[in-house]
Amino acid sequence: MANIEKQAGELQEKLIAVNRVSKTVKGGRIMSFTALTVVGDGNGRVGFGYGKAREVPAAIQKAMEKARRNMINVALNEGTLQHPIKGAHTGSRVFMQPASEGTGIIAGGAMRAVLEVAGVRNVLSKAYGSTNPINVVRATIDALANMKSPEMVAAKRGKTVDEILG
């Protein structure tokens, strides 16, 4: 399902989906391919890319380039999430919550690939609604982007981390 490769520069790349699509024109159908990939450094940086070309390798290459350009930083807490989070994109909704050490990545399909390359080692998650890989990846990255560390919350409120954590 998701192929992983190590790149120089220590970026992990995963291929989530390759689809054959067609455009119908007067002379028949024009076939092309789309590829969905995620890239991460395994330490809180993750991005996804969607590429389209007449050949599969070209589509994958375009998707990888877009993924490297669109990376976000995620505030992780010792290999898990900071707090329970929800994300949504079109018909896909995802819910993720932190898990104790040894739980592993409990996630399905496209969500698992995103979490693995982001560096999350322990998480409980569930995808609701549409399980279209593109929308699930976008919803997962939306959720991770909205996650706040205690330091970020403390800075925003003008308090210390100890006051925030109680």
Swiss-Prot record:
Record's subunit section: Part of the 30S ribosomal subunit. Contacts proteins S4 and S8.
One Gene Ontology term of the molecular function aspect: rRNA binding
GO CC terms of this entry: small ribosomal subunit
Record remark on domains: The N-terminal domain interacts with the head of the 30S subunit; the C-terminal domain interacts with the body and contacts protein S4. The interaction surface between S4 and S5 is involved in control of translational fidelity.
Domain of life from the UniProt record: Bacteria
Single GO BP term: translation
The entry's keywords: Ribonucleoprotein, Ribosomal protein, RNA-binding, rRNA-binding
InterPro entries: Ribosomal_Su5_D2-typ_SF, Ribosomal_uS5, Ribosomal_uS5_bac-type, Ribosomal_uS5_C, Ribosomal_uS5_N, Ribosomal_uS5_N_CS, Ribsml_uS5_D2-typ_fold_subgr
The protein's name: Small ribosomal subunit protein uS5
Pfam families according to UniProt: Ribosomal_S5, Ribosomal_S5_C
Listed SUPFAM superfamilies: dsRNA-binding domain-like, Ribosomal protein S5 domain 2-like
Family membership: Belongs to the universal ribosomal protein uS5 family.
UniProt domain S5 DRBM: residue ranges: 11-74
Its biological purpose: With S4 and S12 plays an important role in translational accuracy.
